């Protein structure tokens, strides 16, 4: 199973600056909180497609690639016309599942970065 956050991507996007990474993770958390409220399969597909688009960019910027991919699939579905409620529900569920995993990994990574003040030794798996 792929990791929820690609640490190499996060490190590259922040030029190895642990403080910047912590800031980026916080911004992601705030963005995800705002956009995730609009992920409602009962709503207009354009609304949840926009939300998925917003989460997608933020996710990929911190290395949450599986979340970005789930968002891309939901966004594409929402922009294709009128998906069924089942299709919408499945796509949005996938986004929410990946978002939950990313937020859990984010908390773990953020804690380690704050404690270590560097990327050295930061891991996603409990050790």
Please name every model-derived segment:
Residues 3-54, 86-110, 127:
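Long, amphipathic alpha-helical coiled-coil segments characteristic
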Residues 1, 111-127:
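Intrinsically disordered or compositionally simple regulatory linkers and C-terminal tails
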Residues 1-2, 67:
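Proline-centered turn/helix-capping motifs that create local helix->coil transitions or kinks
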Residues 15, 77-80, 120:
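Feature targets compositionally biased, intrinsically disordered low-complexity regions
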Residues 47-51, 59-80:
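Short, well-ordered alpha-helical segments
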């Amino acid at each position: 199973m792929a990791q929820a956050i690609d640490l190499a991507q996060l490190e590259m996007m922040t030029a190895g600056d642990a403080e910047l990474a912590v800031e980026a993770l916080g911004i992601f958390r705030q963005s995800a909180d705002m956009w995730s409220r609009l992920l409602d399969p009962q709503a207009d597909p354009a609304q949840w497609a926009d939300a998925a688009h917003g989460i997608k960019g933020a996710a990929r910027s911190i290395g949450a690639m599986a979340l970005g991919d789930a968002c891309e699939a939901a966004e594409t579905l929402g922009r294709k016309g009128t998906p069924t409620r089942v299709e919408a529900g499945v796509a949005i569920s996938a986004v929410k599942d990946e978002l939950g995993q990313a937020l859990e990994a984010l908390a773990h990574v953020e804690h380690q970065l704050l404690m270590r003040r560097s990327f050295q030794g930061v891991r996603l798996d409990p050790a």
